[in-house]
Every structure is written in C-alpha cells, then in structure tokens.
Amino acid sequence: MNKPSLRLLASFALPFAALSQDAVTTATPKAAPAGKAPAVVYFTHDISPDGLAKAYKALGRPLEGRKVTVKISTGEAGNNHYLKPELIGPLVQSLKGDIVECNTAYGGSRQETPKHRKTIEEHGFNAIAKVVIMDEFDQLDIPCPSSSSHLQKDLIGAAFTNYSGFVILNHFKGHQMGGFGGALKNLSIGVASTSGKARIHSAGKTDKTPDCWRMLPPQKDFIESMAEAAGAVVDYMGDRAVYISVMNNISIDCDCNGHPAKPEMADVGILASLDPVALDKACVDLVYASDPKTSASLRKRMEKQLGPHILDHAEGLGYGTKSYKLVSLDGNEPPSTKRVD
C-alpha cells in the first residue's frame, strides 16, 4: 500500500486525592446558548498520577463497579509524545479497566493487529492493563446524530460495546489532518475501526483503504465527518462516560506520526469534563492564551486545517456546548483563557 503524504498522515493503583471545597476556584463563565448552562471543565496544573485521579474524581461520575474501558492512543512506533503508562497506570488500575484501541487506516506500526500489539508492548501498556484492539475480530455500525450532513452511521470496533463505563483519555496536541487532536478526535477516528476511519476520512465515500486516501473530500467536510462520528459515540455512551485531556508534550503533530515535530509549547495541565465539546474548546482556548511565540506553529496548524470548526459542527449537532466555566482544582485561580496575540 502506498503510504499517505504528510496531509494524509494528517503495579501501582493510587488512592484518589481528596478534594476540599477551598481547592476549587471557578473562572468567569462564558456566555451559553439560550436555555443551556455552560459546561464545567475542571483544571489542574498537576500532570501526575495524583493530578489525573483528582481530575477524574472531580467529575462526580464514578465508574467503579462497571466494566470499564480507557480509550487512549497507544502511539506510533518512533513517537514518544503519547500518554505514558507511568502517568495513566494508577487511574486505569484503580478502575480495573481495560485499555482499548483500534487499528489505523494508514501504513505504519499499528495498521495490522500483530504489529500493533508489538507497538503496544514496546510502549509499555501491557504492563499496566489488558489491552484490547477493538476491531481485531469485528466491527459494527452505530447511528450518527440525525442532523448529520455526511455520515449516517459510524463504523466502530465491535469490542467497544463490551463495556459499560468509558474513560475517554486524550492527549491534546496538533494533528496533521485535523488541526488538533483531543476528545472529539479520540471519539471519532480513535474509536472507529480501520474501515470506519476510511469512512470518516472520505466523508462517507468509501470504507476501504487505501481508496480513502484517493477520495479525500474538502477539508471542511472531513472535519464535520469527525464531529458526526464523535457524536455517534457520545450518544452511544450516554451518561456512562467521562472525558479527560492531558496537555503535555504538545507537538503540532499527532501521536500517530512516527516522526513528530518537537514540542514548542510548555506543558499546560490536565482538564476534565462531562462534555467533550467544552473540553476541546477549553484546550483550544488555552493554546491561544499561551505565549504566541511558542504556540504560533500550533495555531497555524489548527487554522490551516480548519480544526476549530469541529467544535462548531459538534455543538450544532447538539451533543455538547462550546460554552464552559473553567474550575481550578489547585486552590487558586484557573488559568486565563483570554487570547494573547
């Protein structure tokens, strides 16, 4: 198979940290659509197992007692920016969760199950949990939001439906094709089977690889297709899911890139919400609120690829809101989300 171009590649469970009321500080809420309250997005500067546990607990949606899955990106061979096992292991193990992934749609170390399993082992994930490749044996369609423009159904790894509790654990960074990768990208491309990824990348024209790389739609249609696929997964999970994003090792390139650009931005923190759209919006806002010298490349990447449009389309589909209030878990004011130019 021809490899796609740069455009195509677009034993330690810890107790949860106790949260005191004086450790929670709220930023001024952003304006919400009429009749809809802003979503709460929790924030901590503490990028550590304790910080991750604190963010999870703050959400107030315990998944203990359910059959839990933690959806991450295991990272392409050669990439070292993915969320490391030593960071996420304590949370995964405290929930007795499985890690889940799907095979990719491009030539690399994760397109086929045997090579993917080798990469998973090399990146250390087998040491912290059982890892399930969701589309190893089967795939299935789930309906997209009724007002979707490009996709009627999202084709996902069938093993996703074996679970009753979902932690969508995202590494926020840039992305060659999507502009940025966060919760919505993890929900859409991340949960889709190889054929489902082809469907999203082609905006519904084909489920086949490598055909999808020869049938790329206008960029706006691709971005909207990701939003629609993410909506299908959000609707399927309902109130059984939590969403957490880690803003560290923030390259302009995705963890699916085996030779990513070196991160230029400083690490930011961990964010968590019950609303994946608000979560991604807060992460994007924090990029624009950061030093414009170090965030310039990521801003350019997001804008060139129409990345923020996924937020508009997702909100329009009705499964999330861009309006949020940022709540600090560190006992101080949350970081400013005001744009800095």
Locate each region found by the language model:
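Extended, low-polarity segments enriched in aliphatic/aromatic residues
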Residues: 29, 33-341
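Boundary at the C-terminal end of the N-terminal hydrophobic targeting segment
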Residues: 20, 25-29
